[in-house]
Amino acid sequence: MPQLEASLELDFQSESYKDAYSRINAIVIEGEQEAFDNYNRLAEMLPDQRDELHKLAKMEQRHMKGFMACGKNLSVTPDMGFAQKFFERLHENFKAAAAEGKVVTCLLIQSLIIECFAIAAYNIYIPVADAFARKITEGVVRDEYLHRNFGEEWLKANFDASKAELEEANRQNLPLVWLMLNEVADDARELGMERESLVEDFMIAYGEALENIGFTTREIMRMSAYGLAAV
């Protein structure tokens, strides 16, 4: 596996590593902050699930603090301006969907796309992380599977009523993931993470989620093609 080989060669204190880390670390911090905000917003939209969603939000807040500690451990200041711009399009799409009461779209963005993005990135990062960050990230990724599962279960229970909106939300938002991956490909490589591995792991996680919700293999392939068009 390329990441495992790269871990033997990485210099966590080099200027090039720290420069790339300042953006990657900011992205994971901002991603957890976005998740905290999104789950709290979903709690307003799904009052019957309020307690569970608030619990998920608090978990994301703990993750954010953990990743902030990872940056401090390497004496790196995260580039939060870059990270906020990085998530801007998904953030605006979630915000617009929430304003229209589109719970299905909000769940696809947060519980499927963002969580699968995180699962892929964290799993690829763990083998090449410094010891401190590895321990933090291993704990975080276990939680992210639980968060994805929440969205899966709700959408599965409401699949027939949600299917058309899910397909449209996928069409609008999946291409953004590939643009985001392309934007950080060089920085990720500096940290020992290959873009191809990130793409593969994301597609596996996202495809599993769509299958669990109720989509057929043919439908998943068609939906995935919207992302590939942006590569």
From Swiss-Prot:
Domain of life: Bacteria
Chain sites annotated for binding Fe cation 2: 60, 115, 147
Catalytic activity: a long-chain fatty aldehyde + 2 NADPH + O2 + H(+) = a long-chain alkane + formate + 2 NADP(+) + H2O
EC number: 4.1.99.5
CDD domains assigned: Ferritin_like
Residues annotated as binding Fe cation 1: 32, 60, 63
UniProt keyword list: Iron, Lyase, Metal-binding, NADP
Cofactor binding, note field: Binds 2 metal cations per subunit. The catalytic dinuclear metal-binding site could be either a di-iron or a manganese-iron cofactor.
SUPFAM superfamilies membership: Ferritin-like
GO terms for MF: aldehyde oxygenase (deformylating) activity; transition metal ion binding
A Pfam family this chain is assigned to: Ald_deCOase
Family to which the UniProt record says this protein belongs: Belongs to the aldehyde decarbonylase family.
Described function: Catalyzes the decarbonylation of fatty aldehydes to alkanes. Requires the presence of ferredoxin, ferredoxin reductase and NADPH for in vitro decarbonylase activity. Involved in the biosynthesis of alkanes, mainly heptadecane and pentadecane.
NCBIfam families registered for this protein in UniProt: Ald_deCOase (TIGR04059)
This protein's name: Aldehyde decarbonylase
Organism: Synechococcus elongatus (strain ATCC 33912 / PCC 7942 / FACHB-805)
High-level lineage: Bacteria, Bacillati, Cyanobacteriota, Cyanophyceae, Synechococcales
